[in-house]
Amino acid sequence: RESGYSYDYANPAANSLVPLTSGFGLPQANLYIKSNLSDGIYLNFELYLASRHHNETWVKGGFLQFEKMEFLPWDFVDEIMKYTTIKVGQFDVNYGDAHFRRSDGGLTFYNPFMENHIMDEFATEIGAEVDVHVGDFILVGAVTNGKLNNDLTKIDTTRAQTKYSNGVHNPAWIGKLAYDKQINSQFRLRASASGYYTAGSVRNTLFGGDRTGSNYYGVMYNAPISNANFTNGRFNPGFGDKVAAVMGNLFLKFSPVQGFSLESFTTLENAGGRGANEPDVRKSNQFVTDLVVRFGADEDFYVGARYNTMKADMGAAQGEPNHYEVDINRVAIAAGWYMTKNVMAKIEYVNQKYNGFPARSIQDGAEFNGLTLQGSIAF
């Protein structure tokens, strides 16, 4: 359950933003069902019961998960499956590690902050993924359809909207290598490198695949708040067709004594791509780092700070001859309390600034800041 939102903002651009006041956002809820179909075979089914973007219940995705394949008669398959997990269906794209800590509709329990990255790397796509665990190393390989909603329609490259498409619904290829180790009783390390590539999928949503909505309610819109205005505070670089992205993540946790720990999570990302109506590939990059201090008998409390900055090359604005570069910077300070293992509350102050946007844009010289309170239940 989410509650308590208040924002201030400044925008000297020609467009005026919708005035805001303090208030509550509607609750969001998710439902996860994991069914054991057979020994080592599971069906994972995920529903959004209610969200900002879709107020009604609808399916997020579902997939078969194989940890054993005893229906195959070969011993070597049993040996392989001791180290391997296979997923087939529609699932979260396993690009980077940031999606493990993001808020996803009603599931905000694992995010110590209120919001996700400015460039929010999240999509559900149809495909297959293989995870191999060998010692402290994890190797991930996947292929998907490269889009949220599948489309079998032949691509018409004579149309302006798809003029620069290669005319093919290309798959997306995802890879990850991670090292995750509890070095000793006090120190844990996880480092990973990931990549995502599609030669052209026309409707790719790697940076715009969330269908639930931001937790910064109402900011940065010049139209009345509705379920269509749900990406507040985020930025999509518009790589709807060709996409090549790489991400590095580093997680460190130091626990010198019982009931106290320091943890840090850092993301470095570089991406390039274009829409099907663009001739040139554009670039974007993002850097995010946070520090969280946990304390209390069972680390029931925490305080944290996050810095997020991104830059992106954008196509020429309407009426303008040249490309332009934008950057957005965010600072967030948060605190939280795990009242039980299933119930938590958190509060965050955020300040976000926009630079380099065209004069016709509501982001030109824009800034918002404010305080948000949120309650979360997971069971």
Where is each model-derived feature located?
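A short, polar/proline- and glycine-enriched secondary-structure boundary/capping micro-motif
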Residues: 150-152, 357
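Outer-membrane beta-barrel pore domains
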Residues: 18, 63-66, 187-379
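Short, contiguous, pocket-lining structural segments
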Residues: 122, 142, 162-169, 235-245
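Short alpha-helical hairpin
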Residues: 1-12, 227
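Short aromatic-enriched loop/helix-cap "lid" or pocket-rim segments at secondary-structure transitions
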Residues: 99-102, 153-154, 203-207
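Alpha-helix capping and helix-loop boundary segments enriched in small/acidic/polar residues
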Residues: 118, 164-165, 362-363
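Outer membrane beta-barrel
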Residues: 1-2, 13-149, 167-185, 190, ...
